[in-house]
A protein has these predicted regions:
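Solvent-exposed, low-complexity segments and loops of surface/extracellular structural proteins
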Residues: 2-9, 13-42, 55-90, 101-118, ...
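Catalytic cores of secreted/periplasmic lytic hydrolases that degrade extracellular macromolecules
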Residues: 49, 86, 180-183
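Extracellular LysM carbohydrate-binding repeats and other cell-envelope/extracellular binding modules
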Residues: 177, 255
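Asp/Glu-centered strand-loop micro-motifs enriched in Gly/Pro and often flanked by an aromatic residue
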Residues: 225-227
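Extracellular glycan-interaction surfaces
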Residues: 239
């Protein structure tokens, strides 16, 4: 068929026949570029078979392909070459009360259709091949046929006529043909019902058509209950057709199937409690208890009765306990899965309530079965009637869109199995009883929240209720009829739902004008939401004066005071006496969430305790900005927890903290704790912006890399500790300490501290350093002057934003063999890790080594006078006063080594140069470092000597 064609031509042909249209440009070529022809064909077909979205074109292709598959799997009379021959043979089976066998039906039917056998010949063969029929007396045979054909005994005339026919040599097959023709012709009024039943049971279904869903599900349930497998296509076709015939039931079908070799081999041969336990466990998914075994043992030894009882008891159960409900839902899911029911459906409310209505799986409108509901993963619901839609069986539902405008009650799975549903709500009147998982409910602009009656009952789980707001003049409008309850768990609600209104009245008198203001809020319409999401907040404060609107220009301000009862009225000029709101006990008790971009959001009157925290759950982008203003003495800490699920970096933007405390016994916001975590391979990013003179400690933990910028406004920060983080950090500290820490830290490392104390007192040296500690991973730490940095393990990069003789940086654990030092003022990088070497860099100049004895002598001389500045002090102790400086050089000591960068190239140490102390780095290791950068170096390497100056 495909001889001489290229792989692309073959794949294109298969795609076109599968989808009924040509493939998108480049799609097939890309598949072949990344796989074989066989794998590409598999992808093309499986993508269509497994599609569970709502694109009309793809759904049309899927429906067309399903029809082709159904015609192959359920060929009906196509196997026999036509309907007539099959109908004739089915009539023979019907008239003698034998269940048809597909092989015989197709074999004899094909011969009739081909003309190799007449109907009469086929009928004669049919009787002669069955000894049980041949052995009957003529009288018994006639009575059998009439009982099966008409549901009655033959009249005396009919009995005499046919027995006489047979007694005179008439063929029994011919008699069957005659009765068949009679039933296909005109019958008396009393036989019309029998005729209709005959025609129903002997008319083969069209190719690709199969019995109704209820029959299919019954067949599937038996196969799941005994052999514990999915029913095959032929079995489904045969046995669902069997159930559609008169007098057949689930029990009779079970009785037939139990006798089959496969069923006997796979459990049906068991007896007593062993059989009951086998079926019960297969159906329920858990073993039966002793009481349950005893219950079904009362049914006796009829295995078919026991089987159908176990199946029906579970499928029709009205129990409400989670265990039974879960078992019921699971069995319906297994049934639906075995019948390859679609996992996506467009639905509407059923007029009588209950399960939703749709055309899924049948192509015609019907109320979905429990099994159809159980397999749903994606659904679009038109909530078009004020009734109830039951989606509780949908334990695997992941995505639900609710359209329409009616006050439809939508019930989701609440038995604890569903992990959570992403619900998009385009209906402002819906009543949503969400699942017991972690639901994410997004209310869109299509839902009229300003005038709607929507109710959101989110139940168990850590749920999220989002709304982008509808503010056009800075104030969101929420109907007084809208309600939401987060239920159990830690739940989040968009700040846009919560409004603030200042209602002011004025009274004029001889003493002037007095004002009264009432703070109003709709916070009471919402309960059990522990966190407030500030992402996308566009609200503000509404205000009136004597009933007329007042312009408020506070921007996107969220007053947490409407929740804690501490709201303020600074937005208006004349508030007068204020009546505040009552505090809410169930809103915002665990602080705030940032899920997306926050456009200059101001949060005021923030409480302490667990409220003083922000959870970052999504990428807000670098342009996002939130500032928190706390109540006075509210808290001593603020926690920022990154907890996003992502595959790209999560940026919290800029966070500002404004706090105040009482002068006596006040509580200052001294600690900012950042947990950089999440799920996925990404980094977290945060900019601590604004000004806060109270924060002194920034602690970093978590298992995700953190890129942290601490603004210069955090002038009191003295400790930045990331040692509890396990992934690494990029810390930019724009905070400088004060004093002469680089000198004192150096001198404190020597045994002659009596001299150093005298020098500190003489020169007034003091130390108020910023301490920065990295992680055990590869960190980047950027520090200002008067900082002491500990990188931790890993290959770290230390960036000197500024490090001078007056305010230098000390690095306590610099490893020349793996770490890198970057001087941002000169643009130079220094290391001995191999990345910079003699081929691409320049070795540092070596200004010598200052021994302990030499230093002690120098320090003793300093005490006697002659040193008037820190520059002179360093020139003295480093022994570089009388030698010209190269562009980059080092001086060693037993305590570590100094790095000096002559930035202005004047050959001497001054305030324009970079000076940093590498504590613990030996003279030899320091001298072996190389540097490179865009600036040309000056000078040459100095001869190594032991400095001993008087």
């Amino acid at each position: 068929m495909y001889g001489g064609k290229s792989d692309l031509e073959v794949l294109n042909s298969i795609y076109t026949s599968t989808y009924g249209k040509t493939a998108p440009d480049g799609y097939l070529a890309d598949l072949l570029a990344h796989g074989s022809l066989e794998s590409s064909i598999t992808t093309v077909v499986n993508d269509l078979l497994n599609y569970n979205g709502f694109d009309a074109g793809t759904l049309a292709s899927q429906s067309n392909y399903d029809s082709q598959l159904n015609t192959i799997m359920y060929p009906s009379y196509d196997v026999a070459g036509g309907a007539q021959g099959v109908s004739d043979v089915l009539a023979l089976y019907y008239l003698v009360g034998i269940d048809p066998v597909s092989g015989t039906v197709n074999s004899l039917g094909s011969q009739i259709n081909a003309g190799s056998l007449t109907f009469e010949q086929a009928a004669s063969k049919f009787v002669n091949d069955r000894p049980a029929l041949k052995s009957l007396t003529n009288d018994a045979f006639v009575k059998l046929v009439f009982t099966e054909a008409y549901g009655r005994a033959p009249t005396s005339t009919e009995l005499n006529s046919y027995t006489s026919f047979l007694a005179n040599g008439g063929d029994r097959g011919q008699m069957l043909v005659n009765v068949t023709n009679d039933l296909r012709g005109t019958v008396g009024a009393n036989d019309q019902a029998a005729q209709q039943q005959f025609q129903h049971d002997t008319t083969p279904h069209a190719p690709g058509v199969i019995a109704d869903l209820a029959s299919q599900e019954q067949v599937a349930s038996i196969f799941l209950a005994i052999p514990e497998r999915n029913v095959d296509a032929q079995g489904l076709d045969d046995w669902s057709s069997y159930l559609n015939k008169d007098g057949h039931s689930l029990n009779s079908l079970t009785a037939k199937l139990i006798t089959s070799a496969e069923f006997q081999k796979k459990g049906a041969a068991l007896s007593g409690n062993d059989y009951i336990q086998h079926v019960f466990t297969a159906v329920h998914g858990v073993p039966a208890t002793a009481a349950q075994l005893a219950q079904y043992a009362k049914l006796g030894s009829d295995k078919s009765l026991i089987t159908t009882a176990i199946i029906n008891d579970l499928r029709t159960s009205t129990a409400t306990d989670a265990a039974t409900v879960t078992q019921q839902h699971a069995f319906e899911y297994d049934i639906g899965t075995s019948l390859t029911y679609k996992t996506a459906a467009t639905l509407s409310a059923s007029a009588a309530g209950g399960n939703a209505t749709g055309t899924v799986n049948t192509g015609s409108s019907h109320v979905l079965t429990n099994a159809e509901t159980a397999v749903l993963v994606n659904a679009v619901l038109d909530a078009n009637a004020a009734t109830t839609v039951n989606l509780k069986f949908a334990d695997h539902l992941a995505n639900l869109t609710i359209n329409g405008g009616s006050a439809t009650t939508v019930n989701l799975s609440d038995n604890g199995v569903n992990t959570g549903v992403d619900v998009t709500v385009n209906n402002g009147n819906v009543i949503l009883n969400a699942s017991s998982g972690d639901d994410d409910v997004q209310v869109t602009s299509a839902a009229n929240i300003a005038a709607g009656t929507a109710q959101f009952n989110l139940g168990n789980g850590n749920d999220n209720l989002q709304w982008a707001g509808n503010a056009t003049n800075g104030v969101n409008v929420v109907s007084t009829n809208v309600r939401a309850n987060g239920g159990n768990g830690v739940d989040t609600i968009s700040a846009n739902f919560i409004t603030k209104q200042l209602t002011t009245t004025s009274t004029s008198g001889w003493l002037g004008t007095s004002y009264k203001t009432t703070v109003g809020t709709n916070a009471g319409q919402f309960s059990s939401f522990e966190k407030i999401d500030l992402g996308g907040y566009i609200g503000g404060t509404g205000a009136t004066l004597n009933g007329s609107g007042v312009n408020v220009s506070s921007g996107h301000q969220f007053d947490f005071g409407v929740i804690n009862g501490k709201a303020t009225t600074d937005e208006i000029a004349n508030a007068g006496s204020v009546t505040n709101v009552s505090a809410s006990s169930t809103l915002g008790t665990q602080g705030f969430v940032l899920s997306s971009f926050a456009d200059k959001v101001h949060v005021i009157n923030v409480s302490g305790g667990n409220v003083a925290q922000l959870e970052v759950t999504g990428d807000a982008t670098a342009n996002s900005s939130i500032d928190f203003t706390f109540l006075k003495d509210a808290t001593n800490k603020f926690n920022i927890n990154f907890d996003a699920v992502s595959d790209s970096d999560v940026n919290a933007g800029s966070i500002s903290l404004n706090s105040s405390s009482s002068a006596i016994f006040g509580t200052a916001l001294s600690n900012v704790n950042i947990n950089s975590s999440g799920t996925g391979d990404f980094s977290n990013v945060l900019n601590l912006a604004g000004s806060n003179s109270q924060v002194s400690n920034v602690n970093i933990s978590g298992d995700h890399y953190l890129d942290l910028n601490i603004g210069s406004g955090y002038s009191s920060v003295r400790n930045i500790d990331a040692s509890s983080n396990t992934a690494g950090v990029d810390i930019t500290s724009n905070v400088a300490g004060s004093g002469q820490g680089i000198i004192l830290n150096f001198l404190d490392l020597f045994p002659f501290n009596g001299i150093t104390k005298a020098i500190a007192a003489l020169f007034g040296f003091k130390s108020d350093d910023v301490h920065i500690t990295g992680t055990a991973q590869d960190d980047v730490i950027s520090a200002m002057g008067n900082s002491i940095v500990t990188g931790g393990a890993g290959a770290d990069t230390f960036k000197l934003q500024s490090s001078t003789v007056d305010a230098g940086v000390t690095i306590k654990d610099f490893n020349t063999h793996q770490d890198t030092l970057v001087d941002q003022q000169s643009g130079l990088a220094l290391t001995n890790n191999g990345a910079i070497n003699g081929n691409n860099g320049t070795q540092v100049a070596d200004y010598g080594y200052s021994s302990n004895d030499a230093l002690q002598s120098i320090l003793g001389g300093i005490i006697t006078g002659g040193i008037t500045s820190t520059i002179n002090f360093f020139n003295a102790i480093l022994g570089i006063k009388d030698q010209p400086l190269s562009h980059v050089g080092i001086v060693g000591s037993s305590a570590g080594s100094y790095v000096i960068v002559d930035n202005n190239g004047d050959g001497k140490l001054d305030n324009h140069d970079t000076l940093a102390f590498l504590q613990g780095v030996s003279h030899q290791d320091a001298a072996n470092m190389y540097y490179n950068g865009s600036i040309t170096t000056n000078g040459v390497q100095s001869h190594v000597t032991d400095i001993a100056h008087a």
